[in-house]
Every structure is written in C-alpha cells, then in structure tokens.
Amino acid sequence: MVFFMLIIDVNHGALTLAEEYLNLGYEVDVWDIYQKIKKSEDFKVKYQKLKEKFGNKLNLFFEQPNFEKYDRVIAPIHCPIDVDFIPFTDAVSKILKEKFGNIHKKIINVTGVKGKTTTTSLINHILKDKYSTYLHNSNFGSIAPPTILKVLNSLDIDKYDFFIFETSLGLIKCKYGAITNVLENYKIAGGRKDALTAKFSSLKNAELSFINKRDINRYDLNINHKCLNVVDVDRAKILDKYPLKFKYFDEIFEFSKNIFGLHFVENSLFAIEICKNLVDMEEIRYRLKTFTIKNRMEIKEINKKILVKNINPGLDVKAISYAIKDFLEVFGGDIYIGGDFGIVCEEIDVKKLSEVLKRFNCRYIFVGEIGKELLNYLNGGYIKSYDENKIKRDSLVILREKIK
C-alpha cells in the first residue's frame, strides 16, 4: 500500500523530508504554508528539481488542502493547524531508523531557547580528541530537524563515533538529548499549543535526557522519563568572573581568557553532564580551559585595562544587547558604541537601539555616524573615531563598521 502524505512548511525543511519519503516510495503533497517558494529562489529551484525527478508523485500547494484525504500529515510542532500530525522530530527519527538503523546511539542532540550553539560546540571540543566527531549547529546552517537527514546523507557515517546536532524544534531520536532551557512559555501553533509542551514532548526521543532544574521549578514540571538527568545549574558557584572560574559540586572548572560572559557557566554544565559519560573529569577540565569561540569578539589588555572589541558590519540590536549585558556582568566600565551607516544592506534601527541602551546603567561614548544619531535619544560622550590606546577604564567597544 502506498501512503499518501502531506508535509507542511517549506521554511523548516518540508522539501528535505519530501525527498526522503519520495525515495521511499510515498506520494507526497507539500503545503508551503508561508509561501517561501514564491519568495526564495533556492527553495524554488529545489522544488523544481524534485518535481522533474518524481513527476506526479510530488505536488505543491500554497493554500490549505483537504486534510482528510491524507494517510499522514507531517509538520513542525508549532504548525498552526487543526488536525493531528506527526512532528518533524518524530518523522526524522523514523527515517533515520529506516535508513541508518541504530545510528541514534551515535547522536548527541541539544535543543532549547538559549545556549544551544555554545553547548554543542563545547561538547564537540571536549570529545573530539578521544572520538571522531561531527558537529552541525547554527554556525554551519539550518538547525531545523530535517537538516540532519541532509547532513548524514552527505557523510560516510562509519567514520564517526558521534554526531552532535543543534536543533530548533525539539529532539530527534538520540543517545543523549538535552533541553538547555525554556525561558518562557508561550502559545504556538496559532494558540493551539504551548512552547513548553512542544519542547518537552520530544524528550521521549532521547535515551538519556538532560533538563534544567530551573525549568522544573519554574513550570512545576512532572516529567516521566526512565533516564532523566536534572542539571542543577544553581549548584555552580562562580569563583572568578574573569578568567571565568567556577565550582560545580566538588569540581573546579576554568575557561581561558578568550572567553567571557557568565552564561558560559550554565551552557558548560550541560556539556559536562553529557560528556562525563564518555570521558573522565580531568579531560573535561582540560578541554574546557582550551575552549575558544570563533567570532568577531576580541579581548585584550591595554595598560592593565581590559578591552573587549566587537567590530562587525552586521551587528544587530539583539547582539548588541547581549554584548553589553555580558560585559557589565563581568567588568563594568565604559561602552563605546556606534560606527557607520551604509556598511550592509540592512541598516540598524537607531531608535530601537536607543531603547535597548536605556535599559543599562552605564557610561556611553558614542562613535561615528551612528553614535551622532544616538545622541538624539541618549546622553553620552561623543568622538568621531575610536582610539583603543586612549581608553581610561575597562571598556567594551561595539562598532558597526567594515572589518579591516
């Protein structure tokens, strides 16, 4: 019997899933609920190639089809539809089993709201000396669950001991699965579901699951999982803010001077709890201290003062807010902020940025064209250009300009 299925949401990987099911002999309709194929040349080309290959076995809809004619409906967990459906995480898990057998025993999967990318990067860094690992997180592209299929299809899977994935819509079938946090519970699927239920319902896909004790307390959770590990992030005691050093139970961990930001403590606890099943604690301590992040943030010392520089043509308001928060938590001091207009196509919203800056109690020194515009909304000093040798205190420099 040939199943007739509907897969919804091109933006989150419907075409990738469609290709897998078509190759398995299914007939597939795709509902492009957000009209992405009309807006994206990449999606359009991908659909056209699939259509040429599979012909009438694949059809595309931009309006809601009749759900009753389908044997299965597959969609992201947050999809706003009034019909029972299989979440993408479960569909991907089933295909993995069908194509690759027990590959889930090699998979480490991290989801949540914040900290996913850092946690997966840390896990990879801790394990990669002892094991052959493959990392895919948001630094490398889409983290929608169907992307995992695309990644594994491109690899010789026998070469790797572990695959480490960051996902956005819950956990796929995996050996180790972590939900770093759910910072707020809000309605999804057009108000039909909530984010909390969606995230934690995917815990069933993890053989060993890891969740944040703060979430249990915040939402009064009662989770039934035979191998549930509760990460008590509040057991971590910060010993030094920079270089970041902390005590967790009876172990002391330290990061290098290239890392700053107190959020690294919470992220590292999930990496520690997962990796202690695979390497000894001494190895984890050593690897943590050698961890670095490839980004445009530079930290250095000038005349016994700490200078944190973030010079980036694409800096947005959210990234600026996080950078200031991290800096003030660790160092305090002056904030140099500004730069130039016309660096990238998408200009920064100066008024919106000023509203974010008003939340922080600190001294601003505005720089360049953007800085001059900010003076219309905020009090602060002003300089036309910035000279790092003239800083008077620990300083954070956030400039939206070309990287030299």
UniProtKB/Swiss-Prot annotation:
Write out the residues that bind ATP: G112, V113, K114, G115, K116, T117
Give UniProt keywords alphabetically. Answer: ATP-binding, Ligase, Methanogenesis, Nucleotide-binding
| Superkingdom classification of source | Archaea
Pfam families listed in its UniProt record: Mur_ligase_M (PF08245)
Tagged with keyword ATP-binding: yes
Gene Ontology process terms (BP):
methanogenesis
Look up the EC number in the record and give it: 6.4.1.9
Q: Which InterPro entries match?
A: Mur-like_cat_sf (IPR036565), Mur_ligase_cen (IPR013221), MurCDEF_CellWall_CoF430Synth (IPR051046)
GO MF terms held by the record: acid-amino acid ligase activity; ATP binding
Does the record's keyword annotation contain Isomerase?
no
**What reaction gets catalysed by this protein?**
15,17(3)-seco-F430-17(3)-acid + ATP = coenzyme F430 + ADP + phosphate
User: What does this protein do, in the record's words?
Assistant: Involved in the biosynthesis of the unique nickel-containing tetrapyrrole coenzyme F430, the prosthetic group of methyl-coenzyme M reductase (MCR), which plays a key role in methanogenesis and anaerobic methane oxidation. Catalyzes the activation the g-propionate side chain of 15,17(3)-seco-F430-17(3)-acid (seco-F430) for intramolecular C-C bond formation to yield the carbocyclic F ring of coenzyme F430.
What family is this protein classified in? Belongs to the MurCDEF family.
Q: Which NCBIfam families match?
A: F430_CfbE
Q: Can you say what this protein is called?
A: Coenzyme F(430) synthetase
Which gene underlies this protein? cfbE
